[in-house]
Amino acid sequence: MALDKDGLLDTLNSVTSIPAIPFRQGAIDYDAHGKNVNYLMENNHLEGGRLRVIGIAGTSLIHHISADDQVQLMGFTGEQMGGKGLLMAGIAPNPIGEAERLIEREAALEYPPDVFLIMPLTGVGNAEGIFAYYMDMAERLGRSCGAKLLYYLRSQAELDIAVRLMNESEYFVGLKIGTTVDDVEPIVAGVKEGAALVIWGVGDRSTGPARRGSKGHTSGINVVFVRASDEINNAQRRGDFEASQRIEDEIAAFEEIRFRNGRMYNYSAVVEAMHLGGFDDVVGGEGGPFNPRVPKEVAVEVAVAIEGLVKYH
């Protein structure tokens, strides 16, 4: 959907739902994914009639499916949303030439992504080289297909150049922090007002970062406990950090399971919760590539962690 920059930044000051994509017999289950997207679109608790933001991203997903599958998945998701929400596409930048072609292909869809999240680089690179390439890339893609980009910061070595990209490129409109809460204040202080949005990117435990100045957050649990994430964002936008913290405390045990040991259950714990909840309006699937259903002992932990969260479905 067409938004000017101010409208885009305000819309991104929200919960970005990153739903676990369901798989069946080793392939994306589009019927199930459509059901999950409908759940998110039809259960919008964001105050002020704000648009739902959905991201197809996550290193537990897009790094493991082909470019053709990504284009098909993005096209399907956009059609399912019908232009009534904001769509974010995660892009793995390896190999970088193929990543650029992928952005151009997705930008040509009937319902193209509104923003493209540049995921962390794998392989060796240095900060200045990343800055120089991404500046040139943003200019090329901005001119060729109007792409608006977000930068996913996972390495503190790239903090300074991430801030520079926000300030020096008109096509970078957001910085998603995936490092630590201590990085929020220097990044917020460094990004010029109105240049880009600084977003917390490590799940719904986002009250501390919001107190330090981040705007909006990403959520992997929104696809199953939609109201929890929505109400956290509502409270943060009102400046009611106590209310945000109360909900965050309720979901903390579940988030701890997801993010333990290098985020190893980031995807699969959500899938497990979708199964254990007994819901008929979302589908978890059979587990994705490299991310099978959790071990039995972890499933028991998930069951305990979500006991009090069903009210947020």
Question: Where are the regions that the model predicts?
Answer:
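Alpha-helical scaffold segments in soluble metabolic enzymes
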Residues: 39, 76, 136, 164, ...
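Active-site beta->alpha loop and helix N-cap motifs at the rims of alpha/beta catalytic domains
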Residues: 2-157, 287-292
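Short secondary-structure transition/capping segments
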Residues: 101, 128-129, 187, 229-232, ...
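C-terminal alpha-helical cap/extension of soluble enzyme domains
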Residues: 2-5, 11, 16-22, 43-48, ...
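A structural signal for short hydrophobic/aromatic patches embedded in well-ordered alpha helices
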Residues: 36, 73, 165, 244-247, ...
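A general structural signal for well-ordered alpha-helical segments in protein cores
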Residues: 33, 74, 99, 184, ...
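Catalytic alpha/beta core domains of metabolic enzymes, predominantly
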Residues: 138-148, 153-263
